[in-house]
């Protein structure tokens, strides 16, 4: 069974916003921000310590989790025991079986800040290196700001972007996430900074890596992006982008026309859409870690990608963490188990039905 596809973003003109899962739509510019849905039941229980790294090694930060084509294997990109792989020779990409045992590992010495991940229909693994978690350290000019395509055995098949990055069309800058559409086209969301005039855009490539188009610019308006952090695609081929800095999900068609804007899923760090068009949205930055959103709740919101209804919510068990908490990346296997990749807690959590 093939895994569900995930998607990306784009930019366009006027649109609609769905209010708090009601399904009603109004003009985005007139509406402005809307508080997320916080009061849905939690039908899941948490499995701590499920996945074990080789040799008893401690987990580093992770925001990247995806499902293998068999619906059972779990691919994770992990930051070498800390929050980046600068100077490390540890592998950063792992495949776990259904029991949480690492069965494959690769990527050592190649990736500085593994951030986003996708697995295509052939089982190839795509990982972004945003070079955005170095905490003041100087990134070497021969690494960073790239997207890597690996065969399932770890062989490097393709590289998008040039080492060291570029803010213009000659390269990528802080690629947050990558999505491979069913037709093989590649979408990359760029820009991890929320500062004014930062890079915030979507790149579209052909299946062989040729740049087709670029959309987006930084801003706070209805047609802008601010830190496009996550990508996913539904069964209709609509592109979902987690416009995290603007606390919303933007939905586009594949030509870049803006269709809807949703606020009810909170501040989206990660998005996953399964084959039944259930949507899973991870918020790792609200509540106590966000002064302007103290009344919002971190966690994973679950609902319908068809109409935006929120039906369930897995809250972050940490009430007052000092920094980002709960899942930043999210994926769901063929059995319906949810996996949350966490940055500050440095963990891969599993959520199963109660």
What annotation goes with each model-predicted range?
Residues 1-14, 22:
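Bacterial N-terminal signal peptides that target proteins for export
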Residues 11, 19, 34-35:
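Short hydrophobic/aromatic-rich motifs at helix boundaries and adjacent loops
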Residues 14-17, 48:
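Active-site-proximal helix/loop capping residues that flank conserved catalytic or ligand/cofactor
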Residues 17-27:
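C-terminal segment of classical bacterial N-terminal signal peptides
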Residues 26-354:
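Eukaryotic scaffold repeat domains enriched in small/polar residues
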